[in-house]
Amino acid sequence: MGLWRRMALVVVSVVATPLVLGGCTTERKAPVRLAEREAPAPEPEPEPELTLTPADRSRDVPVSAEVTARVTGGKVVVVRIADDKGMLVRAERREDGSAWVPTVALRPRSTYTVEAIAVGDAGRTTTRTTTFTTMPTSTKPQVTSTLYFADGRTYGTAMPVTIGFDPPIARAARADVQRRLFVTTDPPQPGVWSWLDDGSQVYHRAPDFWRPGTTISVRAALEGLPIGENLVGDADRTATSRIGRQVALEVDNATKQMRVLRDGKVIRKIPVSLGKPSTPTSSGKMVIMEKHQRTTFDTRGEPNGGYVVNVADAQRLTWGGEFIHGAPWSVSDQGHRNVSHGCTNVSPADADWLMKVTQVGDLVTFTGTEVRLQAGNGWTAWNTSWEQFVKGSALPVPAGPRPTPPATPRPGAVAGGSPTPGPAASTS
């Protein structure tokens, strides 16, 4: 057999074999299959790229530091933070996934190790570690923060989460501070932080009133937080409380009457005497801030003051000293004329009844008086429209949450309707 004959037989044998294995077919696909079988193996998928901060060997890291794990071509599945003794540090991931926030401030002058694991789109994993050291306790002046939301309480449906700052927070530093303020609700309800113009207070509220029975947990994680160039935060503050029944008070100067509403229904009307023209009561939407069975009003240190009086069943509405309280000396005026220094006078019996019905966090609305409530004179989060409130956030606010129109357009309506916009000008 010649050389060309032998070569022809070999080629036929190779080509014919797939035809036999393929079964009864007339299609000649063997050359294609041969080419596929001889193609080079695909390149292995690259590992996901994983970057951690604080960067490895970082020093003088603030005790408020958060851990970020950024990945390209995959997703982060594990982040562990451990102290220098190997004890794990609990951390919670931000809702937007941008960082892991330790649930307590880190210790000063301490070393921490972060381990993160990411899985690539093709299933490959990569692990990265970083070690950093926190700064010593700062010697910079502290901003004193006050959380006006106590632990283990029951509040009214209009209760805003309020934090005060001394000194006030400069506009340029507000975004950094706001990122360290956390509110969670059960059941979930959207909410937004909004700053007073002067930076002395920040409020958190929902578009509508809180639902009765809601549990609200708050954390102001400010300990060691750099605030601007020359200040630091003072402490981490936390609290968890619940929202009680829906109660609202409406006071009309024209009629000298207070309407008390529970779940949107009037349950009592009370005659009142408000501030006389020289010391008028403010019009606007306020929130009950404090309740005292007995207290003393002493205005001798004020320019237009000069009296001391003991009062019973007093409920604070403003920082400037407007209260609802029992006033036996003005019972004959209540429902007819205004004689007070700015407070809302009611009879001792009505004051006692109100103390049993109201909660800190209940909404109180005044209409028809000579002056308007000043922003920040009390917890004035409801004394503006939702659209204006959102503009006070130092961070972008996702579009979406808006107030639900109430069935009855009045501030005492059941949660599900925000009060109509109120004034926010100056008061005396």
Segments from the language model and where they lie:
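Soluble periplasmic/extracytoplasmic beta-strand elements of cell-envelope proteins
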Residues: T68-R70, R80, T113, T162-G164, ...
